[in-house]
Each structure stands twice: as structure tokens, then as C-alpha cells.
């Protein structure tokens, strides 16, 4: 080729393949190579063995090649083989190479007939090979055998497509000559991925096994079934030759003799056979690499830029340098502190758009989950009134009280305040859980130092647990402070006079039925989940919740109201999701066992996320719709047992007024307590836990890490990180070397140009049989035409027969003769004759011969 740099291209690509295969990125970079495709038992592996000159590939019946074999042939003075997975081991016995291929295949695919797309990289050094890189792929098959899955045909096809769809991959389409070439699996795949034929090279095997009297001359001359890069014929060893231990050197000599002695192929002998195929593939692969150099250079440069920043940290890396470890430790601690603060306080960078995280989840706990838990702890209305009535009667004792006792108010309030402890402690637990989760998220960046990550998580988590006790003590102190003194002079407390006035107003409202303007608590979309399919199925509506009722509309314009439901006597319960449902569901039901909506005992409402469900539940709590409790039925039965007392209560108007007054006072004071607790709980947790943890990370974490032991052990890298660093450095140097070699290559080197396009429509129609089975190209002398005058020099095919009588006088056109064998066996093959236009014969004269004076005018010809 006149340029030493061009000869180095194939070894360069081999080095790139090894470097990229080692780091698992071979599929990302489209390296120039040759993929060998063909049907099962088409002779692909035999062609590769002929290249090497050794028996080294597994043989047998059915599918033998079950993993892609990347075969890198390197011209060298000594002969040996190396596997990428057996680094440093040289195989001089090629029988061991065969056994290693079988063993490596079984390690991944199993001992039966399974397949895998993971390639085996084999490099063969030999003085008998040219620099070449080929990929031997599993043969295409139709029927699964052994433990192969039923879709083995599609699995193999998908594996082939991973290689042949790449623009830089040449396709070596191997087809046997003794089968219909127009139905060749290899050519079908090649046509599908390379419709222009720019990457496809045809190989015809088993030429010696064709039926007697047939040959593939027209195919090999690229006339019958043309490909842009043409065909090359080879003759492999038969099974008898293999069983007889016929070596490949003798097989190549027999192949050469076959082409020289065969009458149909002797004129093509210098362009047939395995040595010529190897030479052509070497030349075409080298030219293909040269043609793809600009694109390959761009991909290499982009790959280099993508890893350059990371490799920059590794260039001067010294594992035992104490200064490096100290610097890395300081950087890791500082990065962890910054990440933790950003996750808690919020930041514009690295925003999670899929779910809430860090501070956003804690905010949701403070302002949605905690208020919800507070409201859940309130008494049921009937139970609360019953307890107030018992308290009033027990305070009066044997006497009949004339005034409402304030001791009843204090007793009920203290009982209510004590119940706040549970949701407050639960709030602390939820915040702790989120903090620990945030710590683990922030330490993910420390994966390269597993000991440091483990120790850092342990120290910070231990500190959070220590602050947990202090925070819970302070929360309990807040509740005890509320229990210590009932401040009935609070500016927001209604007092006895206002409570009695409100009680009277409520009675008037019940009798008059007048309604003031109602405040809207929440609006939003919900899906009614339990409507039957016959009635339209689940539908989404626009819901409006107020303190008095729940309404839903067709859309958010609120023009077409579908239904309005009173919230009196309603409660909430959770509903399990259906098997195929992705929505989260809760239900409304009537405590008096009445239908809630039409014929339904409960109204099932669905949301997309659990957060929406929790938010709607909190809104329903504000409207007085509480969750169902486990003890509701027991309390209901107790109420029935004490039905006489309830009846007596309802019969005593004075007691009923006193109960209503205390109820209003309790509501007013508990609203003050809840407001205070909802305000102080986030502040307490922020001060004692979250802010304290941030300060600990910034000021004391590093000191704790230094005091925990040996820093060298703490900063030990993980094995995965060390391996990744070595692989990244190896790939970086391989990329730099590749770009350096490519830069030295003269890309203007003259090479064999791409052949011109050919008519390959036969691949689409696929109706032409393989081989020269028609008499149009029979090489044998069995069907010779009668002796005819010699043809003009340079003419193709036999001369036409003598003209029929009357043809010189303008009669019917001559009937074409059936072509026979070419008189010159080394001359060009005969052309395939076209169908002549049929013309009617001339009308003969009475004498049986046309008169010279009255020539017979021919009738105009017509086409059938």
C-alpha cells in the first residue's frame, strides 16, 4: 500500500478492541471489523481455520458457535495464541485453544446449547496470516435444541444485529453453493442492514459438493446474483477429511488444485481460494478503516474528552502518599457537609424531579403529617359529650348543680393534652428517619472509600440518635408545661360567657336552618373508584370540600354540579389498592350505616400518589370528617349499653346546656394548645436536632474521624475503584495512542476504490435459484449445439444458426438458437439470452417459395 502507517491500522484497532472490551465499552465505540454471518453449518468456522492454518475451533452437530468470537490475526515470526480473559498465557498447542473456547463458552452459556452475546477475544500470532480482525457469530437457525429457549431464532438474530448494524462493520456473508443462494440467510441480513451493498462481501463455500452438471460460475463472476464487492469461492475440508486428520496445508493445496482443474473456475483460479480471500479481506478492511478514519477520530476524541477530567485526578495518583490521603479526607468531609446542608436547606443544583427528598420531606412532616396526626387524636363527638356529662355529674355528686363546674373543663382538657404526646413523639421519629436517609444519600459519593463511608455514617447517625433523646425530653417538657397551668385568660380563649352565647347561637341555627357563607377548605381532582362498568366505570371529577358538604363537578369551571354530599356523620377509612391498580384509595362512609352516594355504602376516592391522599385526609379533618378507629365498634356497643343514661342526658335540658358550654370551652382551649404545639414542634426539632447536626458535621465530624483510628486504613480504596482507575488509565492511554497513530497516517493513500453499484434487486425478489442449474450456463459438453461457423473475435456466446428460408426477403425474424457451451473455455461466459419479440411467420406462396419479383410483405410484429 505504500504507507507503513496504513499497515499499522489493523493492529491499532486490535489494541482498541482489547482496551474497550476490558472496560465493557466495546459496544459504545464503533470499531472497524469484519463480522462473519451465515446459516448454521454454512462453513464459517472452517473458513476461519483455513485463515489460521490450524484446527482450533469447536466442531460438532447443530449450533457450535454459541458466543461471538473476536479473532484477531497478527502477522508475526512465531506462532501462538492468547485469550483476553487469560492475560499473559500463551497457547502454542491449538488443541488447547479449542478446549479453552469450549470451556469459556460453557462458563457463560451453560453446558447445553444456550447462547450469549458476550464475546470471546482471541488473538493469533502466526507467520502464515495477514493482519485481520474478524468476528465469528453463531449460525442462524430456526429450531431450538437442548435447553435453548423457543425464541432462539430471534435471539441469534438480535445478536447478529448488534454487530452488523454498525456502519464500520464489514459483513462477510457466507453461503453454501449447494443450496438456493437467493434464499441465503446471510444475504438476507446483509441486504436488510446494508441495502447499498457497500459493506457486504460474498463467500461461496462447498463448491465441490454441487450436483454434477451444475456450477456457480455466473455467481462467482458476479453476473447472476451480483453484489457490489463481489463473491469469492472457497473449498473447505469435508467431514471425511477432518476425520482423516487431513491438515489444512494439504487442504489449501487441494483447494488450489480444484480451482485450476475445474473447467468452470480455471479462468478465475487466481481470484478464488482461501489465500486470496484473506488477502482481499486484509485489503478491504484496511481500506475500510482508512475510509472511516475521520469518523473514528471524532469518536475517539469525544471519548477522550469524556474521561479526561476523571483521568486528570488519576495521572499523579500514588496510593501510599499520606498527603494525598489527608487531602482526600478533607475534601470528602467538606463535600459531605455541603451536600447535607443543600439537601436540608434546598438548592438549585441537583434537583430531584421524581420525588420529595431531604428538607422537602421534613417540611411535609411538619405541616401535613404532624397536623394530621394531631387531629386524629381528637375524641369522637358523641364520646366527648358523654365524658363531659359524666364529669359534670360526678363533680356535683349527690347534689344537683345550679352552675357549670369549671373543674369539668380542666379535667377534659388535661385528658386531651396528654394525648398530644403520641403524635409529637411520632413526629420526632419521622424526622429522625428522614435525617438518616439524607445522610445515606449524601455518602453515596464516598463509594470509592468504603471504610470512610461506613465510619462517617456511623458517627453522624450516632450523633442523631444522641440528639433524639434530648429532643424527645424537650417535647415532653412542652406537654408538661401545657398541663401545668390552664391559661383561661388567653386572648384567643372565648371564656364562659362567650361559650354560652355560642351554645345558644348553635341551638338557634339548628332550629332556623339558615346558612351563612361557607368557607371552602380544598379543591382538586379526585377519581370516584367504585362506580360499576355498566354505569361508566371510574371517572375523574372536580371536588370542592367545605365545612358543611362535599360537592363534585364535571370540570374545574364548576358549572355542572354532579352531586353534593353532607359531611355530617361521615368518616374516613383506607382501602387497599387493587391488583392491577396504581392509584391510592380512601373511602367515605356514614357512621349510621346509611348509603353515602346513591346505592353505595361507601364512596371510594382515588389519587395518583400517597402524598395526595394524606393531604386530602388532612383537609377532611378540618371539615370534621375523622378517620375510622379500631375501637369505634366497641365504643358504639358501650354507648348502646348506656343508652338509658344517654336518654336521661337528652331529657335534662340544663345538663345539655352545660355539656354544650364545656364542649365549646374545650374546643377553644384545645385549638390554642394545638396551635402552640404545631408552632413549637418544628422549632424545637430544628434547634435541637437538625441545626445541631449540621453544626456537628461542619465542626466536629473531622475530629471524630481522626480519633477513630488509622487514617491509612480509613482511606483505603475499594477494589472496584482501583480496578476502575486502572481501566480508565489504560483506556486513556489507548485512546491517546490511537489518536497519535491516526494523526501520523497519510489519509490520501491511494487504495482500491469502492466497486460501482450493481443491480441487486434480486435480493428483494429472491426468485432466482442458486448455482447454474439452467442450461443457459452449463459448462459440460453434454448439450453442445450443432457445428456452426466460428464466431467473430470478441463476441459472447455461440453464433446464431442459419437463417430460415425467406428471411432475407423480409419474413419472420430468425428463431434464436439454444446457447451451448462456449468454444473458448477461457473466454468470457455466454450472455443470458432475452426473450425475443414473437412475430407471425410469413404467408408462403403457392409454389412454397416466395417469388423474387413479388416478395411477400411481412405482417407487422406484435408483442404478446
Curated annotation (Swiss-Prot):
Record region (G4 motif): 205-208
Catalytic activity: GTP + H2O = GDP + phosphate + H(+)
Chain spans, region G5 motif: 235-238
GO BP annotations, alphabetical order: clathrin coat assembly involved in endocytosis; endocytosis; endosome organization; protein homooligomerization; protein homotetramerization; receptor internalization; receptor-mediated endocytosis; regulation of vesicle size
Molecular-function GO terms, alphabetical: GDP binding; GTP binding; GTPase activity; identical protein binding; microtubule binding; phosphatidylinositol-3,4,5-trisphosphate binding; phosphatidylinositol-4,5-bisphosphate binding; protein homodimerization activity
CDD domains per UniProt: DLP_1 (cd08771), PH_dynamin (cd01256)
Protein name stated in the entry: Dynamin-1
Source species taxonomy: Eukaryota, Metazoa, Chordata, Craniata, Vertebrata
Amino acid at each position: 500500500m505504500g504507507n507503513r502507517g496504513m499497515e499499522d491500522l489493523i493492529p491499532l484497532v486490535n489494541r482498541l478492541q482489547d482496551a474497550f472490551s476490558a472496560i465493557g465499552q466495546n459496544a459504545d465505540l464503533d470499531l472497524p471489523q469484519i463480522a462473519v454471518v451465515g446459516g448454521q453449518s454454512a462453513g464459517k468456522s472452517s473458513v476461519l481455520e483455513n485463515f489460521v492454518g490450524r484446527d482450533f475451533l469447536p466442531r460438532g452437530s447443530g449450533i457450535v458457535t454459541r458466543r461471538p468470537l473476536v479473532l484477531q490475526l497478527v502477522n508475526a515470526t512465531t506462532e501462538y495464541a492468547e485469550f483476553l480473559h487469560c492475560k499473559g498465557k500463551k497457547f502454542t498447542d491449538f488443541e488447547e485453544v479449542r478446549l479453552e473456547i469450549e470451556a469459556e463458552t460453557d462458563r457463560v452459556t451453560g453446558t447445553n446449547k444456550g447462547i450469549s452475546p458476550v464475546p470471546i477475544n482471541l488473538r493469533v500470532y502466526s507467520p502464515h496470516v495477514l493482519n485481520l480482525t474478524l468476528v465469528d457469530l453463531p449460525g442462524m437457525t430456526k429450531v431450538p435444541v437442548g435447553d435453548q429457549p423457543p425464541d432462539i431464532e430471534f435471539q441469534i438474530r438480535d445478536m447478529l444485529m448488534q454487530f452488523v448494524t454498525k456502519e464500520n462493520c464489514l459483513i462477510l456473508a457466507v453461503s453454501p453453493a449447494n443450496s438456493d443462494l437467493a434464499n441465503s440467510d446471510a444475504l438476507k441480513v446483509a441486504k436488510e442492514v446494508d441495502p447499498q451493498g457497500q459493506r457486504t462481501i460474498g463467500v461461496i463455500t462447498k463448491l465441490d459438493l454441487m450436483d454434477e452438471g451444475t456450477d456457480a460460475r455466473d455467481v462467482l463472476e458476479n453476473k447472476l446474483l451480483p453484489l457490489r464487492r463481489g463473491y469469492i469461492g472457497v473449498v473447505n475440508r469435508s467431514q471425511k477429511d477432518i476425520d482423516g486428520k487431513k491438515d489444512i496445508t494439504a487442504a489449501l493445496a487441494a483447494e488450489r488444485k480444484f480451482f485450476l482443474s475445474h473447467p468452470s473456475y480455471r479462468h478465475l483460479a487466481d481470484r478464488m481460494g482461501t489465500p486470496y480471500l484473506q488477502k482481499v479481506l486484509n485489503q478491504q478492511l484496511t481500506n475500510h478503516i482508512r475510509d472511516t478514519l475521520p469518523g473514528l477520530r471524532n469518536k475517539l476524541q469525544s471519548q477522550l474528552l469524556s474521561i479526561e477530567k476523571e483521568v486528570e485526578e488519576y495521572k499523579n495518583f500514588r496510593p501510599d502518599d499520606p498527603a494525598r490521603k489527608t487531602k482526600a479526607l478533607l475534601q470528602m468531609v467538606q463535600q459531605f457537609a455541603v451536600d447535607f446542608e443543600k439537601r436540608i436547606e434546598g438548592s438549585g443544583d441537583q434537583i430531584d424531579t421524581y420525588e420529595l427528598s431531604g428538607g422537602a420531606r421534613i417540611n411535609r412532616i411538619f405541616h401535613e403529617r404532624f397536623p394530621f396526626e394531631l387531629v386524629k387524636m381528637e375524641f369522637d363527638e358523641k364520646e366527648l359529650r358523654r365524658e363531659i356529662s359524666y364529669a359534670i355529674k360526678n363533680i356535683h355528686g349527690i347534689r344537683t348543680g345550679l352552675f357549670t363546674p369549671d373543674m369539668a373543663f380542666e379535667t377534659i382538657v388535661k385528658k386531651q393534652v396528654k394525648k398530644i404526646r403520641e403524635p409529637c413523639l411520632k413526629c420526632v421519629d419521622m424526622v429522625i428517619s428522614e435525617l438518616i436517609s439524607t445522610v445515606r444519600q449524601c455518602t453515596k459519593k464516598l463509594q470509592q472509600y468504603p471504610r470512610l463511608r461506613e465510619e462517617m455514617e456511623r458517627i453522624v447517625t450516632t450523633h442523631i440518635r444522641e440528639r433524639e433523646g434530648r429532643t424527645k425530653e424537650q417535647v415532653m417538657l412542652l406537654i408538661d408545661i401545657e398541663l401545668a397551668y390552664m391559661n383561661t385568660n388567653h386572648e384567643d380563649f372565648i371564656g364562659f360567657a362567650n361559650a354560652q352565647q355560642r351554645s345558644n347561637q348553635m341551638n338557634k341555627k339548628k332550629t332556623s336552618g339558615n346558612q351563612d357563607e361557607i368557607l371552602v377548605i380544598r379543591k382538586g381532582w379526585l377519581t370516584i373508584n367504585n362506580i360499576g362498568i355498566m354505569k361508566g366505570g371510574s371517572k375523574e371529577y372536580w371536588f370542592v370540600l367545605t365545612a358543611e358538604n362535599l360537592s363534585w363537578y364535571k370540570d374545574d369551571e364548576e358549572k355542572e354540579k354532579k352531586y353534593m354530599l353532607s359531611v355530617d356523620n361521615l368518616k374516613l377509612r383506607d382501602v387497599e389498592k387493587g391488583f392491577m391498580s396504581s392509584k391510592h384509595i380512601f373511602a367515605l362512609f356514614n357512621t349510621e350505616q346509611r348509603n353515602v352516594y346513591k346505592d353505595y355504602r361507601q364512596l371510594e376516592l382515588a389519587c395518583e400518589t400517597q402524598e395526595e391522599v394524606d393531604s386530602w385526609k388532612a383537609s377532611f379533618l378540618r371539615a370534621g370528617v375523622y378517620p375510622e378507629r379500631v375501637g369505634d365498634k366497641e365504643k358504639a356497643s358501650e354507648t348502646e349499653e348506656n343508652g338509658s343514661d344517654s336518654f336521661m342526658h337528652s331529657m335534662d335540658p340544663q345538663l345539655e346546656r352545660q355539656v354544650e358550654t364545656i364542649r365549646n370551652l374545650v374546643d377553644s382551649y384545645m385549638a390554642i394548645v394545638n396551635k402552640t404545639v404545631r408552632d413549637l414542634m418544628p422549632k424545637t426539632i430544628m434547634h435541637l436536632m437538625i441545626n445541631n447536626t449540621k453544626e456537628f458535621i461542619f465542626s466536629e465530624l473531622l475530629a471524630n474521624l481522626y480519633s477513630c483510628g488509622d487514617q491509612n486504613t480509613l482511606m483505603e480504596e475499594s477494589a472496584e475503584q482501583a480496578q476502575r482507575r486502572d481501566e480508565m488509565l489504560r483506556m486513556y492511554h489507548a485512546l491517546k495512542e490511537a489518536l497519535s497513530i491516526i494523526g501520523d497516517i497519510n489519509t490520501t493513500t491511494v487504495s482500491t476504490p469502492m466497486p460501482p453499484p450493481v443491480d441487486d434487486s434480486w435480493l428483494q425478489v429472491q426468485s432466482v435459484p442458486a448455482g447454474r442449474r439452467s442450461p443457459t450456463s452449463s459448462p459440460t459438453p453434454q448439450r453442445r449445439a450443432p457445428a456452426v461457423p466460428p464466431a467473430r473475435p470478441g463476441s459472447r456466446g455461440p453464433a446464431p444458426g442459419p437463417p430460415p428460408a425467406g428471411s432475407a426477403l423480409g419474413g419472420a425474424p430468425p428463431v434464436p438458437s439454444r446457447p451451448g457451451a462456449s468454444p473458448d473455455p477461457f473466454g468470457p461466459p455466454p450472455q443470458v439470452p432475452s426473450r425475443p419479440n414473437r412475430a407471425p411467420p410469413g404467408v408462403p406462396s403457392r409454389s412454397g417459395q416466395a417469388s423474387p419479383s413479388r416478395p411477400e410483405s411481412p405482417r407487422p410484429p406484435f408483442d404478446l
